[in-house]
Amino acid sequence: MCIRDRPNTEYLVYAYGVDPITIERLTPISKKTLTTLAPQTIDTKFDIQIVSTEGLNIDVLVKANDYDGHFVAKIYGSVDAADTDATVLEKISESWIDNVQIYGWMGYTAEMILSQYTFQQSREIQETLEPNSKYYIYAFAVDDEALRCSDIVFIPITTNDTSIQH
């Protein structure tokens, strides 16, 4: 699979010959439907520990359990009031797929994406959150092609004017 392709997606590929001067089609159109492969999923767990909170500052430690591959761990904050856990997890997954696709268009290889945007064994996250908002601290495994290959483990948290609730 090309890093620019979306996993488990159907594509219609077509080809035909054209005259380079008149731009007229010279051959019949050939069409073929192809489906990209879905990544093989693995069953891995992540420990997400909120180490400390002070006001709107949060310190999180994410550890991979019995998994030595690459993973993504972040805090997602683009949560709408009507979003359910399922819709937020879909947004997180789609956001990663979109980013991998964009990096591919920019010439990044899977290895470059893995080395710059993923982690192994553990990751510490320190952020200052916005007041009166909902966030998801999350982690998921990625394969050698930088595609998500595990369920997303998450903890939802909210903030009020001055502090974090979890």
Protein language model regions, located:
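Structural beta-strand segments of beta-rich domains
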Residues: 56-60
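Extracellular recognition modules
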Residues: 12-18, 136-142
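Conserved small/polar residues in nucleotide/adenosyl-binding loops
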Residues: 1-6
